[in-house]
């Protein structure tokens, strides 16, 4: 009886999620940058013309092209046991008080897989929080997602679909706008700021800096522990704490940038004419 009830609940909750049957390749194929590339007859780029003014999305970035520092910072900030759980971190959920177990202000129990399930379902970050049915549905969605997608696919899709700040969606738009470089070139300091923005996309600079400084400190501590496991690194002095004041100045400058460096082209007028005629 309980099995039938659970199965019926599962079907009801997932019935409206058209993505539930979607493959990673389908989600990646449906991804649309906010700029359209206009090519000439020889396939050379004429211009990138912005065709979606609602958000700023760059190109889809493969996980292998994301810097190790960013992957490290994101997992430390959002989901330390990402590679250990099956969609829901029950250890974190059990440790959290029931009153704020699924509170969006507390990410301790909200895994990357659960967040991705919300993004794929079009929920994003609901301002009023999720209802109990939505919370249960998100848990089930994450479990289904883990059964059909590999971990690297989940992390790659998350990095490309997660909103970072303002109109910026996805790691390519973030890295090129705030840091003026591709995602593979982000260093530890830039990665810490990016991870802080995932937690609170529209927080003020001071809040972003405080969060980023904490993430950077965790990265340094883990790096030191890893070094101490090697014979040559035993007895090494711990690294100095991160310079939060310098990080504050860096984050302040980065968050003021608005230019997206992939918007230039060689023939803007010809490109726009070709786009109108397409």
Regions from the language model: what does each represent?
Residues 65-73, 150-152:
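Periplasmic N-terminal gating module of Gram-negative TonB-dependent outer-membrane receptors
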Residues 77-90, 96-97, 198-202:
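Cell-wall polysaccharide-cleaving catalytic domain and substrate-binding groove, primarily
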Residues 31-33:
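Short, small/polar residue-rich loop motifs at catalytic or cofactor-binding pockets
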Residues 1-6:
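Bacterial N-terminal signal peptides that target proteins for export
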